[in-house]
Design a protein with these regions (language model features):
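The first (N-terminal) embedded transmembrane alpha-helix
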Residues: 32-49, 161
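Cytosolic, membrane-interface loops and tails of multi-pass inner-membrane proteins
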Residues: 5-22, 81-102, 198-226
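Intramembrane alpha-helical segments
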Residues: 104-174
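Membrane-embedded alpha-helical segments that form the functional core of polytopic membrane enzymes
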Residues: 41-83, 91, 115, 132-143, ...
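Helix-coil boundary and interhelical linker segments in multi-pass alpha-helical membrane proteins
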Residues: 48-65, 117-132, 167-190, 240-253, ...
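Transmembrane alpha-helical segments that form the membrane-embedded catalytic/substrate-channel core
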Residues: 69-76, 139-147, 188-205, 238, ...
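Interfacial loop-to-transmembrane junctions
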Residues: 225, 266-294
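Multi-pass membrane catalytic core of lipid/isoprenoid biosynthesis enzymes
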Residues: 83, 91-131, 221-245
Length: 305
């Protein structure tokens, strides 16, 4: 998953002055704690839906611990690569590197160690396939998505791939294969990200422009393509969200809830596309952060045994 602006979530760590931050807060900023938590949530749902029979809680724990290490390492290394650009944006200038609370060498060592240990952990304790998917996620996030942010507006669409792969990792950890259910979860998280990040990019387009990031709202100041991307991907999401029911992973309660949530999310995207204001971008963003956890909760609640 790509970074979520801290100041538009409740109780943001970055709202506190750098001088007042303790090392726990510094660590939380470095590993992008909220983003890592979301990664773990999608991974956990993938594992739960993929698992058959009595739950293996030990394996679940190992999967989550290893995934947390990989996600934390990816977050730290991403900040290392973007430290000069983070310093130019108000919402990121208080991160550990641009604020001077950590040195690049420290972050490099920490991030590399976490990512490497996490991938080895997955391979040895979970399974090799999950480790491979984790490695693809890490490399695509750091060396494809991250540099593309300064090259093309398509970075958001391309970045949705590593952002959605943790859901597939959960499935592979449970089943040991790349089955239809895993790809369905991947597609849901991938399509969900586009309107979510279009709303964020619209709200922060001036900061992105100042930092040199070519987000779609930066290169499309009128917002026509931004609105179309939001609506088209929300429509696609509404369709793919039916897949867990079609593949007999979730039941009719999930189906009904997915339709209601999807229509609500689509409504917010359409309203945003019709009038690209800050207020409607915020509504779309809020709809997105409600949609995904509620949809995942419905999957868990109405899993077909």
């Amino acid at each position: 998953m790509k970074d979520i602006p801290a100041e538009i979530l409740m109780a943001p760590a970055s709202a506190v002055g750098a001088a007042d931050k303790n090392w726990t807060a510094v660590f939380a900023d470095l590993v992008k704690a909220r983003l890592t938590a979301l990664v773990l949530a999608t991974t956990l749902v993938g594992f739960y839906l993929g698992w058959r029979g009595a739950m293996d809680f030990a394996l679940m724990f190992h999967m989550l611990a290893a995934t947390a290490l990989v996600a934390s390492g990816a977050a730290a290394l991403n900040q290392l690569l973007e430290r000069e650009y983070d310093a130019k944006m108000r919402r990121t200038q208080d991160r550990p590197l641009p604020s001077g609370r950590l040195q690049p060498a420290t972050v490099m060592l920490f991030g590399s160690a976490c990512a490497t240990v996490g991938l080895i952990y997955l391979a040895l304790v979970v399974n090799l396939l999950t480790s491979i998917v984790g490695a693809v996620t890490l490399l695509a996030y750091l060396f494809i998505y991250t540099p593309l942010k300064r090259v093309t507006w398509l970075n958001t669409n391309i970045g949705a791939v590593p952002g959605a792969l943790p859901a597939l990792m959960g499935w592979t950890a449970a089943r040991g294969d790349l089955g239809n259910g895993g790809w369905a979860l991947f597609a849901i998280v991938a399509f969900w990200q586009i309107p979510h990040f279009m709303a964020i990019a619209w709200m922060y387009r001036e900061e992105y422009a100042r930092a040199g990031f070519k987000m779609l709202p930066v290169v499309d100041p009128a917002g026509r393509r931004t609105g179309k991307q939001s609506v088209s991907h929300t429509l696609a999401l509404l369709a793919v969200s039916l897949a867990p029911f079609i593949f007999k992973l979730a039941g009719p309660v999930y189906l009904a809830g997915a339709l209601v949530l999807g229509v609500g999310y689509l409504f917010c995207a359409v309203q945003f596309s019709r009038q690209l204001t800050l207020a409607r971008a915020r509504w779309l963003f809020l709809a997105s952060i409600l949609y995904l956890p509620l949809l995942l909760a419905l999957m868990v609640w109405d899993k077909v045994k």
